[in-house]
Amino acid sequence: MFMSGNNYSGGFRELEVWKEARKFRNTMSSLTRKFPASEKYKLTDQLLRASRSVTACIAEGYGRYHFQENIQFCRQSRGSLMECLDHLTVALDEQYIDQTRFEEYESQYETILKLLNGYISFLTKRKQQQ
């Protein structure tokens, strides 16, 4: 059976979790521009890739045919989100960001994590209803 019966006119861009992850991705992009040049191919690249993976996996999962495939991509998205938190911890430890800024990013992380877990639960229930 087709994965979700979603209306593809708005597609994944209508998902609240994707919208919040997009904001986070854009925030990470702005943040990494302030990192030292010595981090260009290290922390900067890792944080950019991980934050982009969060939204990309949600989008790719949305386009899959079966619920289980979508769930798996959402789990990958969740892993990338957690990777971002680790990279932000490194940025804190290296004093590229202060504790207040870290807590702001962590709050965004927690919001996305809750939305992502909710979306995974929704997809799991839909799969069981097939």
Task: For the regions a language model picked out, list residue spans one by one.
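Amphipathic alpha-helical assembly/interaction segments
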Residues: 1-130
